[in-house]
Amino acid sequence: MTKPRLKIIPLGGLNEIGKNMMLMEYENDIIVIDAGHMFPEEEMLGIDLVIPDISYLLERRGKIRGIIITHGHDDHTGALPYILPQLNVPVYCTRLTKGLISVKLKEHKALSEASLKTIPPGGKFTLGKFRIEFFPVCHSIPDAVGLVINTPIGTIVHSGDFKVDYTPVSGKPTDLSRLAQLGTKGVLLLMADSTYAELAGYTPSEQVVGENLDNVMANAPGRVIITTFSSLISRIQQVIDAAAKHQRRVFIVGRSMMNTTQMALKLGYLNDPKGILARLDQLKGMPRNRIVFVTTGSQGEPTSALVRMANRDHRQLHILHGDTVVISATPVPGNEGLINRTIDNLFKQGARVLYSKLAQVHVHGHASQEELKLLLNLVKPKFFMPIHGEYRHLSLHAKLAQSVGIPEGNIFVLEDGDILELNPEAGKVTGKITSGNVYVDGLSVGDIGSVVLRNRRMLSRDGIVVVIITINKQTGKLMGRPDIVSRGFVDTREAKDMLEESRDLVARTLDHSGARPTEWSLVNTKVKDVLNKFYYEQTKRRPMVLPFMVQV
């Protein structure tokens, strides 16, 4: 009889940044690790977010014992409002992570039905045949954890997002002693964060950012505007501390930033002992050199507070000449264009802008190469699987693992949807499941597919031509010349002759086709074909051609 194997299947987070989601399956038990979203790429027109395809989980809903969240960043929690109502399983996380998830679920009116279980760092719990332990890791957010997962075939360590920082601003350092203990007992598989596997050396401490923010507030002649991710609680604390030192008041701007700040204050993860935080209605009459704004918009999101300020579109606040704007975040891949446009607009408004290329106003929360090697040497896993990163990150992390003595045959560089099957002696990729992207477009989730995106790209690039064909209902004959309406294709005044010629071309095509009204599909195809060819010959463009038939 074949012994059961442990299946490990990534649903997101491999060969991409964000959308982190992993499942483990043993016999009739499944646990899910993280459920994040990622930002759309530039060609994903009109898409707000991208989340993992959970078809595999929906087909096995009865086997899912829970979702485990390693920390509160959106790339690990952002899919929960969309998938929890479908799966209806409990979520296990630390206290701050629960608070951040609650804010997100409340915004989507999904909180009342959710079951959120709080587990402290160091806590242990059992889900089916899996025994899970949270161990503290240092990241750019408090209450981040890695996972020790005891399975019937051996111990698995999941690093979560981590770095080695001995002087964290808030939260605990990564528990290296626990990792060393695990290494002496024996670890079957290590899955570790690869986001910054390209960078040599060590990741700088978060203290560096605090020192630079302090310097900015000491020297800025006017208002200071700081933008970061709303979930970067430790960064917001650094702003409050620096503002208090320099007699400035802090105003929180942006709905998500406000909600997160209020939650973190309530739970005790943010401290404001000197009453530095203020409301916008207290702003009037305050000297500019006593003002700090903390706002959303670090990724150039079009509807964020900072972008609206940069475009002079914010209802309450505008950029003033002499403002200092600090972008305390690095661009998520795909958002570079949005951020650069925002920076340009801020400069145009007369602001001084500080960002990663000009000042160290942000450090990332991920381990660099020496920290990754330290983790590998402490844990001493039999097998290794790099996670969280694009292919180059995973590949470089795999090379690091080889450099510390893990055999190449024991290292698994997977893609989303790959099925890795493990037993105590060996592991191999045995197949692939349906995985990929589900697009969130406003209120629509999952009904935007590749065809819709292709059409949007076509419209944005080459425009649209609508052909209105009037047909006699009785005879099926064309009545007059077709009308052609163009948008985003050509200047109708300059291309008047070409559009007139295309009207004649459609009329001749229909006269020769002999199509009856019942043969509209044939008419539709013929009109599209002839106009696509004609317009490409004339302009080297391929507008979307939409024929409409009106029967009178």
Identify the residue ranges that each predicted region occupies.
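Short glycine-rich phosphate-binding loop at a beta-alpha junction
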Residues: 90, 385, 544-547
